[in-house]
Regions:
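C-terminal-biased regions
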Residues: 1-42, 54-127
Length: 127
């Protein structure tokens, strides 16, 4: 009788372990991207436009490397929205639109925070 419960318990344990790992990995990744965007914002405020564009490009490349994982574990709309925000931010940096870029970077950092929050292992997200 007890042996019958072992496979379902093992499956539940594997799901819990993956959920905890995914939550930590998502938080670490989004924190890294948000820090990169904060650095780009600081460079923009210093009016170092080539460095701003390079920092955004580097952050976008880092983001792009995680697209497969993000589309597997996150809501597609949230990931697609962040993707569009990255592209708009890079366009604003290329055009040297400081006020538009600043607003877009703030929105993008908030979107990344929400991505991490959606994947956080919590009662709110479980229910």
């Amino acid at each position: 009788m007890k042996k019958a419960f072992l496979p379902p318990i093992a499956v539940l344990e594997a799901i819990l372990t993956f959920s905890l790992w995914n939550s930590r990995a998502m938080t670490a990744s989004t924190d890294r991207w948000r820090n990169q965007l904060q650095q780009a914002d600081a460079l923009m405020q210093a009016e170092s436009w080539p460095d701003t564009a390079a920092a955004l490009s580097k952050s976008y490349e880092d983001w792009a490397q995680c697209q497969t994982w993000l589309h597997i574990v996150s809501e597609h709309d949230a990931v697609d929205d962040a993707e569009a925000m990255y592209r708009r931010a890079m366009a604003f940096a290329a055009a040297r639109e400081s006020s538009e870029l600043r607003a877009e970077l703030a929105d993008l950092r908030d979107q990344l925070r929400l991505l991490a929050e959606m994947e956080r292992f919590s009662i709110k997200n479980v229910l």
